[in-house]
Amino acid sequence: LSRFPIVDHRYVRFPDSGNDYLQADVKVGDDTVRIFSVHLQTSGISGLRQRFRKDHGRDVPVERVIGELERNSRIRAQQVREIRAVIDSTHYPVIVAGDFNDTPSSYTYRRLKGGMTDGFRAVGNGFGGTFRYLGGVLRIDYIFYDDRFAGVGYYMPQDDVSDHKAVVAELRFRRI
């Protein structure tokens, strides 16, 4: 849904995964902006814990947790490489937003961000935690934008629709 005309789009579902991204070219005045909405591989821990408790009646051994984290991290890294290649090949102004399922210290964050600006770091405030559980301090949902934009505002509306908080960035074009 957009108040601006969508002039082109592409939906990509990652193989062997419930994850995907949508790439949309949106006409804003005389400019076309390429927006990526991404949902990357989860850590898999919640599902693993539920299955293990159901099957074995106890919590998951730490070795299994580490293995699951490593496996899903590799999957996320491949997804990021694919998206980054598309970003690098575009000449339009770019916005990347979504559920990265990884922290700001991760390969996922650094590789996908590249030279773009993290909206929260630029104009947000507080901890910026987007995952509702584990104390609410994990930031795993992001909005990145390239240098043709300037951040005006960044906030998280109050809703309880998901285990993740929504993030909103207000941007304006930089006129060079």
Which residues are covered by each model-predicted region?
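A solvent-exposed, charged loop/short amphipathic helix patch at secondary-structure junctions
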Residues: Q50-L69
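Soluble or luminal CAZymes and related metallo-dependent hydrolases
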Residues: F14-D16, R71-E82
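Structured beta-strand-rich core segments of catalytic domains in phosphoester-bond hydrolases
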Residues: L1-L48, A150, Y155-D159
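Short charge-dense sequence patches
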Residues: V26-V28, V33-F36, R58-V62, V94-V96, ...
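Metal-dependent phosphoester-hydrolase catalytic domains
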Residues: A77-Q78, E82-I95, F100-I176
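Glycine-rich, phosphate-binding/catalytic loops in enzymes
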Residues: G18, F52-K54, R111-G115
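Short aromatic-enriched loop/helix-cap "lid" or pocket-rim segments at secondary-structure transitions
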Residues: S46-Q50, Y107-Y109
